[in-house]
């Protein structure tokens, strides 16, 4: 797996090695070809706000956006395609300043929040979304399972990027995350297509 991190945020405390590790783990667990590529861009609030308006027509910043290179169906790739081969999956955009605010409200550190958002972004690259309630429940359950498994994988290797949080907001359901989004001024992750 080739994961490139481009950090243009100017924000302290972003552990690029952790972002690469969690993305590599998640994509591997999802049976993505080991030669696949993805990019994680870490940006400032102004850049994220611009992208959010330009691509989602939503004002203000958000924590994560994903730009898949191809339209995939969860677990199967494109409906008309062969199984995943080596490919460029797409780009994940993270905003650590916004993520830090969410982490503080949720009661865990920014490192965990960025790992959660990277997992969320990887699932979007693979075709998962949260437009419909049943899809949202499936995506958030899978996100939490993968993130829990990543912490277990890190422990088995004797690696700790940040302590595994045990608070209720660390592995949120879709409903929990919606409540958190209301607490952080200026953004959040609305369900795709959700009226503002």
Curated annotation (Swiss-Prot):
Pfam families in UniProt: YbeY
GO CC annotation, single: cytoplasm
Cofactor requirement: Zn(2+)
Cleavable signal peptide: none
Keywords: Cytoplasm, Endonuclease, Hydrolase, Metal-binding, Nuclease, Ribosome biogenesis, rRNA processing, Zinc
GO MF term (any one): metalloendopeptidase activity
Subcellular location as annotated: Cytoplasm
Binding site for Zn(2+): 120, 124, 130
Main localisation: cytoplasm
Note accompanying the cofactor annotation: Binds 1 zinc ion.
Top-rank EC class of the record's enzyme: hydrolase
GO process terms (BP): rRNA processing
Cytoplasm found in the keyword field: yes
EC code: 3.1.-.-
Protein family: Belongs to the endoribonuclease YbeY family.
HAMAP family: Endoribonucl_YbeY
Function in brief: Single strand-specific metallo-endoribonuclease involved in late-stage 70S ribosome quality control and in maturation of the 3' terminus of the 16S rRNA.
Identification of the protein by name: Endoribonuclease YbeY
Native source species: Corynebacterium diphtheriae (strain ATCC 700971 / NCTC 13129 / Biotype gravis)
Upper taxonomic lineage: Bacteria, Bacillati, Actinomycetota, Actinomycetes, Mycobacteriales
């Amino acid at each position: 797996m080739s994961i490139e991190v481009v950090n243009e945020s100017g924000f302290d405390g972003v552990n690029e090695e952790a972002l690469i590790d969690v993305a590599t783990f998640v994509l591997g667990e999802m049976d993505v070809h080991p030669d696949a590529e993805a990019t994680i861009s870490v940006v400032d609030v102004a850049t994220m706000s611009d992208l959010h308006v330009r691509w989602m027509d939503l004002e203000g910043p958000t924590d994560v956006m994903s730009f898949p290179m191809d339209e995939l169906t969860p677990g199967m790739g494109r409906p008309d395609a062969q199984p995943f081969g080596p490919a460029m999956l797409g780009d994940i955009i993270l905003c650590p300043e916004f993520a830090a605010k969410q982490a503080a409200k949720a009661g865990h550190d920014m490192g965990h929040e960025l790992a959660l958002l990277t997992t969320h972004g990887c699932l979007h690259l693979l075709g998962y979304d949260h437009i419909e309630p049943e899809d949202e429940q499936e995506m958030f359950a899978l996100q939490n399972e993968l993130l829990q498994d990543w912490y277990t994988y890190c422990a088995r290797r004797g690696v700790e990027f940040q302590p595994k949080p045990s608070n209720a907001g660390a592995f949120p359901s879709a409903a929990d995350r919606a409540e958190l989004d209301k607490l952080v001024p200026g953004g959040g992750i609305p369900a795709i297509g959700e009226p503002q």
